[in-house]
């Protein structure tokens, strides 16, 4: 029988809560907390599940949770309330090991998405999901991006955070330099002095990296200068711009895997 946790002050519960609330703690521990009856099993397909916390009612609704790996703990409802990031939850939580990937894994001829200082968790999650859907080989994040493993980002990505390699690369211009050294064309998404998509698509025989900037400021001048060229999405004058999640997803679709 699984161990039952009745106290909100239990050490495992306090540890899991800290993973949920602190990006620095997630990085130092190499772990993250996720919640949801669908999300936890989905994440377990691509990341190591160490601890599963569930309420009695959650297991009754989703008995297949019993087949997941890791240590399982039955928690009382008030304990689950402490673990939850939002007021209404499904009573299922998992502590996972964070997958680790580096720029050394980037392959010539691959398709990549790079995000520079994209701070909205919803946009980061949406772009991870789009990159996975359109057959991209990895996502590269600069310093200052929203945490991939924060609760809101995980919900938005719907498990894509472990279905596609995520590389935390630090300074984006340096990452772009490494990508270009492998023959990858790096396209900076920019509103001005940019080539149209049709021209950009014809110029990427050796792989492509779509580079998206922050919601408010866009890409830094240094990153734009490091890229091969700039690209824009054709639009009417009825709107000034699109948010990072929408613009990035459109670009990812244009450079999707050829078999799709």
Would you name each region that the model predicts?
Residues 60-69, 223:
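Short, aromatic/basic amphipathic alpha-helical patches
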Residues 100, 105-194:
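RNA substrate-binding interface of SAM-dependent RNA methyltransferases
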């Amino acid at each position: 029988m699984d161990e039952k946790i009745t106290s909100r002050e239990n050490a495992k519960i306090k540890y899991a809560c800290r993973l949920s609330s602190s990006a620095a703690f997630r990085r130092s521990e190499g772990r993250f907390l996720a919640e949801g009856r669908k999300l936890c099993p989905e994440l377990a397909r691509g990341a190591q599940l160490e601890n599963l916390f569930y309420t009695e009612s959650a297991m009754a609704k989703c008995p297949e949770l019993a087949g997941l790996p890791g240590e399982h703990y039955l928690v009382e409802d008030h304990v689950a309330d402490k673990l939850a990031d939002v007021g209404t939850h499904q009573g299922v939580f998992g502590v996972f090991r964070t997958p680790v990937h580096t720029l050394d894994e980037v392959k010539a001829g691959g398709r990549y998405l790079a995000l520079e200082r994209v701070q909205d968790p919803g946009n980061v999650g949406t772009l991870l999901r789009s990159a996975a859907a359109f057959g991209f080989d990895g996502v590269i994040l600069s310093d200052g991006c929203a945490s991939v493993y924060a609760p809101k980002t995980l919900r938005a990505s719907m498990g894509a955070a472990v279905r596609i390699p995520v590389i935390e690369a630090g300074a984006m211009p340096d990452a772009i330099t490494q990508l270009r050294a492998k023959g990858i064309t790096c396209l900076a998404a920019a509103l001005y002095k940019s080539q149209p998509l049709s021209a950009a698509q014809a110029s990427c025989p050796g792989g492509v990296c779509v580079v998206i900037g922050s919601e408010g400021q866009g890409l830094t001048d240094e990153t734009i200068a490091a890229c091969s060229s700039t690209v824009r999405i054709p639009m009417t004058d009825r709107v000034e711009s699109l948010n990072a999640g929408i613009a990035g997803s459109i670009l990812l679709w244009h450079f999707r895997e050829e078999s799709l």
